[in-house]
Amino acid sequence: MNFENLLIELGTEELPPKSLRKLAESFLANFTEELTKADLAFSSAVWYAAPRRLAIKVTELALAQADKVVEKRGPAVSSAFDAEGKPTKAAEGWARGNGITVEQAERLVTDKGEWLVHNAKVEGVETKSLIAAMAQRALDKLPIPKPMRWGNNKTQFIRPVHTATMLLGSELIEGELLGIKSARTVRGHRFMGLKQFELAHADHYLADLKEKGKVIADYESRKALIKADAEKAAAKIGGTADIEDSLLEEVASLVEWPVVLTASFEEKFLAVPSEALVYTMKGDQKYFPVFDDAGKLLPNFIFVTNIESKDPAQIISGNEKVVRPRLADAEFFFNTDKKHTLESRLPSLETVLFQQQLGTLKDKVNRISALAAFIAEQTGANAVDAARAGLLSKTDLMTNMVMEFTDTQGTMGMHYARLDGETEAVAVAMEEQYKPKFSGDTVPSAGVSCAVALADKLDTLVGIFGIGQAPKGAADPFALRRAAIGVLRIIVENKLPLDLVTLIAKAQELHGTNLSNANAAEEVLEFLMARFRAWYQDKGIGVDVILAVLARRPTRPADFDSRINAVSHFRSLEASSALAAANKRVSNILAKVEGALPTTINASLLTEAAEQALAAKLNELQPQLAPLFANADYQQALTLLAGLRESVDQFFEDVMVMADDEALKNNRLALLNNLREQFLHVADISLLQ
């Protein structure tokens, strides 16, 4: 079979930078799926993307589908011939349709009878005749929320399309993509190199674009180049560039020929909290801030331009002029905000509605303050600081800085709290109340911060559930799923001795008569339990392990986590499978018992050696297990219980539990009930698979 390399490129107007990678990856995935469906073999496939193009290259693509034999079954032999042995009309019609005579048909014998059959050879179709349609289907399936039309064309795409190129080796594939006829013409950079040129071979794509068109089409190469050059530029001025991957991705999606330059701003702006300056540089201007070895912001930034200029100083000056007014705004807002304390902003919270039925932001901070103090008292944190931080927690939302630069909420609250002379614990809590902000973010670790963060999230959870607006489907306007995961992570990762039932009840109490849903507390608890399952599944914990712990319904998250870890460890023990099966058997036996389960074991009724041995082993372990359960040392407890395997196996081998003698039967049921209860102190291991 012959092979050749395939290139497909779509030349467009500037594509949305935040969607570029996803579009390219989806194009490749969709097209390779088409190749697989068409039974076209290939070695590998990659995607390329730049602001004005999407491309894929397939290596060693088969030039044709493989020939194959298709079995075409006809009528049963019993109905294919009449009494005289002549072909019936049905048989002749089938044969004629397959281009053969009945005599040329083969016979197929199955367990259901004998059939006429024709093994037809189907020649594979040439790849070049399939490419255009497959590429179009791949493009049609791209994730484009708002397609657009251009000119008089009825075709829709994310941006107007100007060129389409499909090359199989050096051969141009005929056809159209999005209404554009395939041609060798490829467009270069807007302002450098050749505006357009013809591509002779699929393998020349990257090199020709780079040399002739001044375009680096390989997205990953462009990204790596920007990162390396930015790091070098920062090092030259004695600093380190803050190169966040999401920003790097966006910048790489904005340029075809990246040129990294360094600029500066007046040192006076460094008096403004660095977070506000960084937000301006990264969020608004797509610049990379530079920090010294001590982590202090330098009066410099690194930016990426899309052109090699004969006068880079002019480009640098232009970018400095652009960023200066934004930094001046931040400076003005900061200086203006400092004139008023956070406490003085409390009355203004009464003008902002949190939720129609749940009151204003002032109502919310009052609840947060009380709940944070309650939590702090249980965890040993400073309750006075927790109450104060809760009260001030939303006041920075009323500052000019946060109104202009919304992502600085909390952070600016921390800075303003320090300027107001609040305690450091209160100041830090102002920032950490929102943690974790996203998956993988850190959680607060300081006691006061934990109390405020938990109070804020629980107040929202209980309040929204309390007015009957729980998340439905994918809709979650109040980000309750994130809040729930945040509650669990904060408690678990800080090993806080908190019970969800108690916390929910207190939050519900603080809402007073606001809540109309009588089942709110139970619904919030169920919601949090469901988040437990999702969180642990994301961490790679087996569903059966999670269900085994959920069966015991522990409502203390730190305790829940200890049980998960213990059961996960138990599964690694050699005895776990046998004991899980035994517990399942025990559960099934006990489930059939009518009325209350017997609990008292009468030693004199233990007549079999195996039941005597099991009872003795349990009696030996129970004094050791009691303190382990009390101290939540579940892993050690299950490790000890794993030692029961041989005794349990022997019991089921030798002992008839459901004996005819009622006293013996009840005694054995009591023994099994006692055995199961030891494991149930941790989890229902009968659910382990």
Curated annotation (Swiss-Prot):
EC number annotated for this UniProt entry: 6.1.1.14
Keywords: Aminoacyl-tRNA synthetase, ATP-binding, Cytoplasm, Ligase, Nucleotide-binding, Protein biosynthesis
GO process annotations (BP): arginyl-tRNA aminoacylation; glycyl-tRNA aminoacylation
Pfam families per the UniProt record, alphabetical: DALR_1, tRNA_synt_2f
Catalytic activity: tRNA(Gly) + glycine + ATP = glycyl-tRNA(Gly) + AMP + diphosphate
Enzyme type, top EC level: ligase
Assembly and interaction partners: Tetramer of two alpha and two beta subunits.
Membership in a protein family: Belongs to the class-II aminoacyl-tRNA synthetase family.
Family annotation (SUPFAM superfamilies): HD-domain/PDEase-like
Record protein name field: Glycine--tRNA ligase beta subunit
Source superkingdom: Bacteria
GO cellular component, one term: cytosol
Gene designation: glyS
Location in or out of the cell: Cytoplasm
Molecular function in Gene Ontology: arginine-tRNA ligase activity; ATP binding; glycine-tRNA ligase activity
